[in-house]
Amino acid sequence: MDIPISSRDFRGLQLACVALGLVAGSIIIGISVSKAAAAMGGVFIGAAVLGLLILAYPFLKARFNLDHILPTIGSLRIHPHPGADHGEGRSSTNGNKEGARSSLSTVSRTLEKLKPGTRGAEEC
């Protein structure tokens, strides 16, 4: 049984649900004694904020042209820069390579000890 509802009524219901979630979450947090109850109030507030974002998305999309912004945000990549030389007398890239080799040799020695049938495995 489908009941027709106008877009204006639908937005009103969404806004009422958001307001109810905010009020309920605030009351639960305000009267809570335990941390678990306060967390439940936080869940109510989080759900209300999500509902508010869903409600406001069409307006934000039209106002800020999110179709243009969102692909740009999605293609952002973080490219870390090598750290500054700390006066050790060698470049940071060589230090990283030597550190990686040292770690690799440590892992290799540990794996050799764990192999069945080798002397290192019998000592453990």
From Swiss-Prot:
Residues 80-124 are annotated as: Disordered. The chain crosses the membrane at residues 13-33, 40-60. It is a multi-pass membrane protein. The keyword Lipid metabolism does not apply. Keywords: Membrane, Transmembrane, Transmembrane helix. Its main location: membrane. InterPro entries: Kinocilin. It is found in: Membrane. Residues 110-124 have a biased composition (Basic and acidic residues). One of its GO terms (cellular component) is neuronal cell body. May play a role in stabilizing dense microtubular networks or in vesicular trafficking. This is Kinocilin. It comes from Homo sapiens (Human). The gene is KNCN.
